[in-house]
Structures are given as structure tokens and as C-alpha cells.
A protein has these predicted regions:
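Extracellular glycan-modifying ectodomains
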Residues: 2-136
Length: 136
């Protein structure tokens, strides 16, 4: 019962937020899965590669500080990462934990596809510092 109420209330909030939305193609750059939740709740297409992943605050800040180089750098697979999901490594050793993917090739394909839609002139950045893999 409580779960059903939560779903109904969340959808009511989502409808209200969608009705106020004027920017239909924001590039949300988040250090965890929050951006994906926001895109889903607002019914928007993903305009960012930062979906279904987690980055430590240190790695996220390094990526932001070196944005133009990082976003165009090659992402290589980290073999034997110790995690049960793929991990990639970009510029300056920045690690990307693709926590909702099974295979690195799939996560890399989505990363590249969404990088093509990224709009640096229409970007919002959010760092979450709630601990390891919060909200993922």
C-alpha cells in the first residue's frame, strides 16, 4: 500500500515539474545516478553521458577541472577492478564506475553516444557527497 502511494505521489510531483519545464534538453552532469533519476522523472532524453554511473568526488572534480580534455579523452577498461560491474579509466586516471551495466563495451557505447548529445552551453553540474555509490 505504501509503495503504491509513493508511486502516485511521485507521479503527481513529476507532472507538476514537467508542466513548469522550459529547458527540454539540459545536459545534467552528476557524480552518481541522480541525473538519470531527474531525466526519467522529467520525461527527457539523456543529454549527458553521466548516466548509470558513479564517480568519487575526487575523480569527478578532476574531470570537471580538465573538462575539455576529459570529455574527449579515450575511456579504457580497467581489468580486474574487483567490482562486479565495468570500470573505465579516462584522462588523468579518472575512474568511471558503470554500476548499472554488465559489459564494458555496452557502457562505453552508451558513453560515446551520449557524449555526442552533450551541450556544454546548457549544462548543470551536481556533485553528491553522500558516500560510496550513494543513490546508485
Amino acid at each position: 500500500m505504501l509503495g503504491k502511494v509513493k508511486v502516485i505521489l511521485q507521479e503527481r510531483i513529476n507532472r507538476k515539474n514537467r508542466s513548469k519545464l522550459t529547458n527540454l534538453s539540459p545536459s545534467l552532469v552528476c557524480s552518481n545516478c541522480t541525473g538519470g533519476f531527474l531525466y526519467h522523472w522529467l520525461g527527457l532524453r539523456f543529454y549527458s553521458p553521466f548516466i548509470n554511473l558513479y564517480m568519487t568526488k575526487e575523480d569527478f572534480l578532476t574531470a570537471l577541472e580538465n573538462w575539455d580534455l576529459f570529455i574527449h579523452s579515450e575511456i579504457k577498461e580497467v581489468k580486474n577492478s574487483g567490482f562486479d560491474y565495468p570500470v573505465g579509466e579516462g584522462l588523468l586516471g579518472v575512474k568511471i564506475h558503470f554500476v548499472h551495466y554488465k559489459a564494458f563495451a555496452d557502457s562505453l557505447a552508451k558513453w560515446k553516444e551520449r557524449c555526442e548529445r552533450l551541450n556544454a552551453d546548457n549544462m548543470a553540474v551536481m556533485l553528491t557527497n553522500w558516500g560510496v555509490m550513494s543513490l546508485c
